[in-house]
Structure formats: C-alpha cells, structure tokens
C-alpha cells in the first residue's frame, strides 16, 4: 500500500525481533509513493541492535506518517540547519525540490557533522543539493556554527526562516544568537522529534 507522506515526516517502525514500535524520520521522497528510505544512526541500544538483527527482505510494519515540517512558508530566504543524523528530514525535502522544480527563494543548508561516518551520509548530498537548487555548507561540528555565520551568508536579510533538526542544546544556542539579528522564535522551525 502506498504511503502518502510529505517531506520531514516520520513513521513508527516495528521489526520482527522487537514488538515495540520506534519512530524514524522518512529520508526519501519518491513520486511513486511505493518506496520509503529511512536513515537510522546507532545512538542507543535499539538502534545498535538493528544492524545485527535486520535482514534484507525482512517484513517491517510501518505506521504513519506522523509529524509536520512545513517548508512552504513565504520568506526572502530559507536556512536549514542539520546536526548529524538531523539531515534526514532535509533529504526528503531536497528530493521533493529536485523532482518538482527549484525553490521559490534562496535556501542554504548548513550540515554540521563531526564523525567520519556522518561525513559520508548521504553520499550524494552535494549532487542532490545542486539538483534541488540549494546551497550546501558543510561544517565540522567541533567548530561551532554561530548565528553570525548564517546571517553573513544570508546577506543579513530580515525575512529569514530557519529550519533546525539536531541536538536540543545546539538549537537553543543558535536561536539565542539568531534573535540578536532580529530572527523571531516564530521564524525558527525546530523538529523536536527526539524520542529514541
């Protein structure tokens, strides 16, 4: 059965080896709606076990989609900030833009990664951003991304909306800095999906 979803949504997945459903962001946007891709990083006991327990062709129960990240907000510029595996909702929006046409305003994607594995995912991110008309900025997470970096690249535009998916402490720090540049909390869209 096709799963109708919009970029940025998540589903609950139940695997054969575990009766409990767990939430994961959908990291794809296929026009045929017959395929889904999830990016799952080993962050806890359950996600660590998946690499060992999952087998190709295994049945998985998919519930949802749930959640809503609205990327269709009018602004002079959009800024997307992803911390590590927080890139997943942006991947689905990039695929949507690639298939439906370029964005209506400039978009900057700031991808903050620290570990070597994160630098490799997704392998086609540069190409995907180019095809979607989005400017990619890769930042080593050990170097702190600050509001001043974002605002310099945004030509200090006042009508900027920011979408964030990553650690809560990073979100709080970034929002505090952006508010000093006149970016309101209403213009800061934070994916608070932090269940594991």
At which residue positions do the language-model features occur?
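Short, conserved phosphate/pyrophosphate- and ester-handling motifs at nucleotide-, phospho-/glycolipid
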Residues: 8, 86, 167
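Reductase modules of NAD(P)H-dependent flavoproteins
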Residues: 45-47, 104-196
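Conserved beta-strand elements of the Class I
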Residues: 77-81, 161-163
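Histidine-anchored nucleotide/phosphate-binding helix
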Residues: 87-101
